[in-house]
Amino acid sequence: MEIPDVTMTINSTNASADTASLDATLAGLDLAGRLSFVAGLGGRAVFTTSLGIEDQVITAAIGTHRLPIDVVTLETGRLFKETVDLIDETEERFGIEIRRFRPEQDDIDAYAAKYGLNGFYESVEARHACCHVRKLIPLGKALEGAAFWITGLRRGQSGNRAATPFAEFDAERNLIKINALADWDIEQIRAYVAEENIPVNPLHQRGYPSIGCEPCTRAIKPGEPERAGRWWWENDEKRECGLHVAGAEQTPPVSAIPQR
């Protein structure tokens, strides 16, 4: 694994140039090289895992190479049991801690009072509000003090993600987002998992290529896009939880969150 001898300082003033340079550098590296390079730039690096097959590949690389990258997950309170069980299995397998960030019960109660516990089925606004409470607020806490946010986004996951770069500046959170697997397709992912014997969510074998909260995820049909089972009752262009959508952090839908 050959890592370029490059020192970079990422700052908001030169964000576009810094990010473009970093994107070009990462394009020439393999997965372990990309993660090692980012870990060596200085500043806290955080990887958010949903325990999906892509994220398991990144977690395996972090654990195998003992990289100084914090691994965190958003335990929304509505995950599949298989996903929750995989957290412990993954920690044990790779000797790492996956730190869990959970929503506040007061926020959940306020959401339920406004929309109903399962109100996300009734409107896009209600679904976005649920994701805001269960994902976006915990994500903000997970990324506090981070300079780099590593994700498992891939270009092949959906049309919305077809232009995913290796590095992009997140102005709302004032950090650099690193999409370390942007150019991997699902066949590369599966081959790597098989070669390295990486534990994966058993739901993948039951027709769930993309796994989120249990009430909002279904198995897909043959020929459907990988993320077709996420919020399947909505139009494709709206099928994002807000974690990777510009503007979602600062301008959420009508809030169900109480003022404190």
From Swiss-Prot:
Family: Belongs to the PAPS reductase family. CysH subfamily.
Annotated organism of origin: Agrobacterium fabrum (strain C58 / ATCC 33970) (Agrobacterium tumefaciens (strain C58))
Name of the protein in its database record: Adenosine 5'-phosphosulfate reductase
Subcellular location, record wording: Cytoplasm
InterPro entries found in the cross-reference section: APS_reductase (IPR011798), PAPS/APS_Rdtase (IPR004511), PAPS_reduct_dom (IPR002500), Rossmann-like_a/b/a_fold (IPR014729)
BP GO annotations: cysteine biosynthetic process; hydrogen sulfide biosynthetic process; sulfate assimilation, phosphoadenylyl sulfate reduction by phosphoadenylyl-sulfate reductase (thioredoxin)
Active site per the UniProt annotation: C241
Top-level taxon of origin: Bacteria
GO molecular function: 4 iron, 4 sulfur cluster binding; adenylyl-sulfate reductase (thioredoxin) activity; metal ion binding; phosphoadenylyl-sulfate reductase (thioredoxin) activity
Cofactor: [4Fe-4S] cluster
EC main group: oxidoreductase
